[in-house]
Amino acid sequence: MRENRPVIALDFPTLEDVKAFLAKFPADEKLYVKIGMELYYAAGPEIVRYVKELGHSVFLDLKLHDIPNTVKSAMRVLSNLGVDMTNVHAAGGVEMMKAAREGLGDGPILIAVTQLTSTSEEQMRDFQNIQTTLQESVVHYAQKTAEAGLDGVVCSAHEVAKIKEATNQDFVCLTPGIRPAGAAVGDQKRVMTPADAHQIGSDYIVVGRPITQAEDPVAAYHDIKAQWNDQ
């Protein structure tokens, strides 16, 4: 189920910024993009419709976490938008995740967030009061996600092998925190290069600033895509 296109995180504040960025790419180049909270809350459903009308694939990254019925209803709305992928927080529980699957239907990919890539083991223990290792926590959440009937998880590339071993090889692992060699790590605590993620078995990678803030975003995208596909 591996996706050969890096997923571009559209971390922009407005629809106009997105339009300007996407206009840099040839019209026949179909991208896979991530729309997160900032952009969705600023532009609303229109941003999803606009990107889909251009023929691009959309990962709507809202990380839903609420009571099962509320999440189910919200997912039904997102399904009508035509998103290709969306997510919930695994910490919401198995029943919530099952409700999300029911609301979204069987078409779009539904994944769960395990531990954010900005979370360190020290933070997890001190703030969340989880006294296992970070990797054990992530694998536990992944197993519960599979039990709920979801397609996969958001996880660091460091946990991919253990997750697939604990679930199955078709279980989707989407990896944020990807940076080309030599790039600044920003606010991500656990990062890897596109080539590393390829070797370790990630199915999707998410790349933001190294593409969106590059002097030549199209060239940066193609370079990262080549690294991701081990070319």
From Swiss-Prot:
Question: By its UniProt entry, which Gene3D superfamilies does this protein fall under?
Answer: Aldolase class I (3.20.20.70)
Q: What EC number(s) is this enzyme filed under? A: 4.1.1.23
Going by the UniProt record, its keywords in alphabetical order are:
Decarboxylase, Lyase, Pyrimidine biosynthesis
An annotated GO BP: 'de novo' pyrimidine nucleobase biosynthetic process
Active-site positions, per UniProt?
Answer: K63
For this protein, the record's InterPro entries field holds: Aldolase_TIM (IPR013785), OMPdecase (IPR014732), OMPdecase_AS (IPR018089), OMPdecase_bac (IPR047596), OMPdeCOase_dom (IPR001754), RibuloseP-bd_barrel (IPR011060)
Which class of enzymes does this protein belong to? lyase
Please give an example of a GO cellular component term from this record. cytosol
Q: Which GO terms describe its molecular function?
A: orotidine-5'-phosphate decarboxylase activity
Task: Please give the catalytic activity noted in the UniProt record.
Answer: orotidine 5'-phosphate + H(+) = UMP + CO2
**Quick one: which pathway?**
Pyrimidine metabolism; UMP biosynthesis via de novo pathway; UMP from orotate: step 2/2
Q: Does the keyword Lyase apply?
A: yes
* Residues annotated to bind substrate: 11, 34, 61-70, 117, 179, 188, 208-209
Asked if the keyword Lyase belongs to this entry, the reply reads: yes
Q: Which HAMAP family match?
A: OMPdecase_type1_B
Quaternary organization:
Homodimer.
Q: Which PANTHER family does this entry report, sorted A to Z?
A: OROTIDINE 5'-PHOSPHATE DECARBOXYLASE
Family statement: Belongs to the OMP decarboxylase family. Type 1 subfamily.
Q: What does this protein do?
A: Catalyzes the decarboxylation of orotidine 5'-monophosphate (OMP) to uridine 5'-monophosphate (UMP).
Name of the protein: Orotidine 5'-phosphate decarboxylase
Q: Name the encoding gene, please.
A: pyrF
